[in-house]
Amino acid sequence: MMRPVVVKEKRVNESQIHAVEDEVRQAKTMDRDIVTHAMKQSFAKLNPKVMIKNPIMFVVEIGFIITLILSFLPSSSSSVPGWFNITVSLILLFTVLFANFAEALAEGRGKAQADSLKQSKKDVFANVVKENGDIVQVSATDLRKGDIVIVKQGEMIPNDGEVIKGLASVDESAITGESAPVIKEAGGDFCSVTGGTMVVSDEITIVITSNPGESFIDKMISLVEGAARQKTPNEIALNTVLTSLTLIFLIVVVTLPIFTNYLGFQIDTAVLVALLVCLIPTTIGGLLSAIGIAGMDRVTKFNVLAMSGKAVEAAGDINTIILDKTGTITFGNRMAHTLLPVGNETIEQVGKWAAISSVLDETPEGRSVIEYVQTKSISYNREIAEQGEFVPFKAETRMSGVDLQDGTKVRKGAVGAVIEWVQSQGGMIPKDVNQKADLISKEGGTPLVVAVDNRIYGLIYLKDTVKPGMRERFEQLRQMGIKTVMCTGDNPLTAATIAKEAGVDEFVAECKPEDKIAVIKAEQDKGKLVAMTGDGTNDAPALAQADVGLAMNSGTTAAKEAANMIDLDSNPTKIIEVVGIGKQLLMTRGALTTFSIANDIAKYFAIIPAMFTLAIPQMEALNIMKLTSPLSAILSALIFNAVIIPLLIPLAMKGIAYKPMSSNALLSRNLLIYGLGGVIVPFIGIKVIDMIVGLFI
């Protein structure tokens, strides 16, 4: 009997292995295609109209053109051999190509994602309901905002919209990558649907909320392709500083011949070009665009759609995070934690009636009561409950239960509501009911009273469990200097208990959606940058007010339009990871800038002695690396300057490993690694290259 089972398992495992192998092969093929395309784009980007957008690399390209021209214009006054000019020009060409390759590679990853998104934008037709009730089939491209469309099982949702009738399971894997379908229904915060997703069961009627070219997928394609990418304020500021440095060094190099003529010797033009390229920050200049694009790419890979690079950078500077309790800090499903009998009742009696009141209750709380009673092996008569008439929970009554066929009425619900119900039937209230209810509230739980007719048997302790690891994550945020504020509709007692258990810094109890705006503004008035999550229409104003607003993809259109980031997985806790990605982006840019500028120190010690030693013998003292000759020193510095760019591409694309710590500790760590390392690595690299170059000249 066991053999068929074993064979079946083996086949399943083999098919899974083959599927994984296919995915790996596809990923490798995609990577090869991206690299091949990036190599082609490296040459296409040599167009001066494109290069001028990066002033640093544009200067290098001009240097390449000058030295290339000099290679074909022999001069009797030149102090360097003819091959030197062509060698310098080739090194400068590869320097520009490597920088272009870094940018094209980052862009290529985005375009690959865009291509996969375009797969969902096939020729889709929609069943439009006209004003007279007729149903007409039209192309999705002809849909306009306000059109009413019916989508049946197996059909593609033609454009973004909101469900106004019906309920259906929707496959959103084309957008989110998650294979499990999600429920979409009319009303509430889960009525929003996205064009390109598919209805897998039932039928829904939707109202279109976007015109062609304005849909969610259109925005995603535009963003990941980089068409809508604008440089962030920090990126612009850094680019301005680097361009200013380049201009200063350009003036220095251009005026240098005046100084050397005064000393009685001349410097060859190719050497001056080499000096300029070694002086300007070419490393960070060549990688700056790639770092920004890769930062957006990392967020996208995390299934978060950032509406701009500014939003990602702002996430890295966040000081305060506003978090909802339910679904973010806690699981959001209150589960039966324990049973508390009152008066002279027993736990078996409480469990029996609690279970009977919950047999027909399909809510998570009702299911958890049944599961708890079963785990405690408490017996109850399920059959009499199933034969009874279920009384659903209502906001007015604040309780639910079942009316049995023999006339017995079983109820469970809010303390005050059940006490009032029992008293209306002439029942007496045990003295310890309120005492035990307060005890449950103090521990952060929710008390439900169980009563049968005019008699209270006890309480159900419902507990909304804090998600595992939240305290540790909040501690990491605290180390990063980020304050966490929990907003909840719970009473202050329950809120304080949950806040203490989770480890948040502050909490706001009995918080209404409009109160969140006040909390955000109060933090911003202190000069803080604030992040928050939300999914409902009532969250939209606060999402718009926050510096980083992360909306859930399952939420309303209003929430997604107000936010500057959208989480495709609809996981509110992801805001913590988004902050980490933002900090990683800022750190990567800062660290590579530090490394690039520190690099120049070693290049100075290589190229400056090589230029001036013949005229000023005392400059030989600066040749601390003992390089072979002036020409080999210049070429070695240029070669290192070129090859360091492709060597740093993986770091620019992946980002620097980020560990939560204080700003001062982070600064010290990066200065040690990328500042000191930026000085040491070029000394070693230039010396090794010089030893190799010295063998050929």
From Swiss-Prot:
Q: What is this protein called in UniProt?
A: Potassium-transporting ATPase ATP-binding subunit
User: Which InterPro entries has this protein been placed in?
Assistant: ATPase_P-typ_cyto_dom_N (IPR023299), ATPase_P-typ_P_site (IPR018303), ATPase_P-typ_TM_dom_sf (IPR023298), ATPase_P-typ_transduc_dom_A_sf (IPR008250), HAD-like_sf (IPR036412), HAD_sf (IPR023214), P-type_ATPase_bsu_IA (IPR006391), P_typ_ATPase (IPR001757)
What's its EC?
7.2.2.6
**Is Transmembrane given among the entry's keywords?**
yes
Report the active site residues: D324 (4-aspartylphosphate intermediate)
GO cellular component, alphabetical, reads:
plasma membrane
Name the principal localization, coarsely classed. Answer: membrane
- Main role? Part of the high-affinity ATP-driven potassium transport (or Kdp) system, which catalyzes the hydrolysis of ATP coupled with the electrogenic transport of potassium into the cytoplasm. This subunit is responsible for energy coupling to the transport system and for the release of the potassium ions to the cytoplasm.
Q: Which organism is the protein's source?
A: Bacillus mycoides (strain KBAB4)
This protein's UniProt keywords: ATP-binding, Cell membrane, Ion transport, Magnesium, Membrane, Metal-binding, Nucleotide-binding, Phosphoprotein, Potassium, Potassium transport, Translocase, Transmembrane, Transmembrane helix, Transport
Q: Does the keyword Transmembrane helix apply?
A: yes
- Where does the protein end up? Cell membrane
Catalytic activity line of the entry: K(+)(out) + ATP + H2O = K(+)(in) + ADP + phosphate + H(+)
